[in-house]
Amino acid sequence: MVSEVRAQYEAYPYPTRDPAEEKTRLITGSPSHVLEVDHFVFGGARDWSRPLRVLVAGGGTGDALIQLAQQMKNAGRAAEITYLDLSTASRAIAEERARVRGLGGIRFVTGSLLNAAEYGEFDYIDCCGVLHHLPDPAAGFRALLAALAPGGGMGFMVYAPYGRSGVYPLQEAFATLFDGMVPEARLNAARKIMAGLPEGHPFKANINLGDHKDSDAGFYDLLLHSQDRAFDVTTLCDMLEATGWHLSGFTMPALYDLGRLTEVPDHLGRVERMALAEKLNGTIKTHVGYAVRGSEARGQGTGRNRALIPHVKGLRAADLARAVAQGQSPKLSFGGLRARLSLPKEAARLIAAVDGRRSLQEIAQATGTDPIGMGALWSRIERELGDHGLLVYSSILRR
């Protein structure tokens, strides 16, 4: 099975990337946005005078590697990054992307994440879209924990079942039909069948999926992968706990907030609430989040600590502040979620003061907001923005 997976990524490195485009754009996302790493792994208060030792486990064509290396360079912070992947074709693309950007401090290794500890001890591990492709995912979780330095953590993405409806029956059918065929032949045969699917087919009805439309590599990874499983929230949390990890948080908490969908029975625990929200939502196709060592379980950054430095992520703080001051309720649409931000006009002055360098205490002083007013307003801001992945805490820009 491992040889089939390797053959797939040698034939179709994923995701499809053109290194020449590094001259004109930086692909960012979750996990491994550097602000998120600080927020979820280090409580928003990492000592950035120390180099960040990073393992990108299953680095593919380099999205996480390039994002993190470039953001560290932009912030003037030191990083020692190890890229690890089975595919030499994927590695070649990642190396060229780094070369085009002039990024240094990267060690490229061809190998398995099951041997992660052989390559050192790491403060942060990225493992995006890999663990669900292992024959024994638990072995992968344990192998990464063995490579984790004290106080460190991991950013992960694993597939979720409900937003991928229609995928797995097709995968099973194609695996039987095309057994023994080379990747190129499998792809051509599958495309012919897909062209004839009835309009009412569950896969065609699933508007959350798009990889099969983007490229040959995307089609193959979605529908022809030889080793693929999905984790619902309960299974994922059980897996993390069983392998020595603790869930720090998902990057989009609103997706897992049962209270946004219905009244919450008092007897439900945290995981039960998230699991029910996942089922009611029905559109979550990946779980993206961060985890720390179970024996070092700790919370993510929170506004209760006024020494932390907030960042508005994904949009301009000034633009958001202007909209809030005008009484607008900006629309949000991502991850299967459609919502509107609802903030009082008084919150605008606090949002406008967020510059990635001032602490909450300094923002309160600069805006003349008393402690009680600050607490009330900021809790609203944190819930509205933080739950939608738009607010994190990090000291990376503070000198």
Locate predicted features.
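Conserved alpha-helix/loop element of class I SAM-dependent methyltransferases that forms part
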Residues: 11-52, 67, 71
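Conserved SAM-binding loop of SAM-dependent methyltransferases across substrates and taxa
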Residues: 61-77
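Conserved SAM-binding strand-loop segment of SAM-dependent methyltransferases
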Residues: 101-114
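A short acidic, Gly/Pro-enriched loop at the edge of an enzyme's catalytic core
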Residues: 115-125
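A short SAM/SAH-binding and catalytic strip from SAM-dependent methyltransferases
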Residues: 123-137
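A short glycine-rich, Lys/Arg-flanked "PGG" loop and its adjoining helix->strand segment in the class I
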Residues: 138-150
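Conserved class I S-adenosyl-L-methionine
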Residues: 153-205
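Long, charge-rich, low-complexity alpha-helical segments
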Residues: 258-291, 336-399
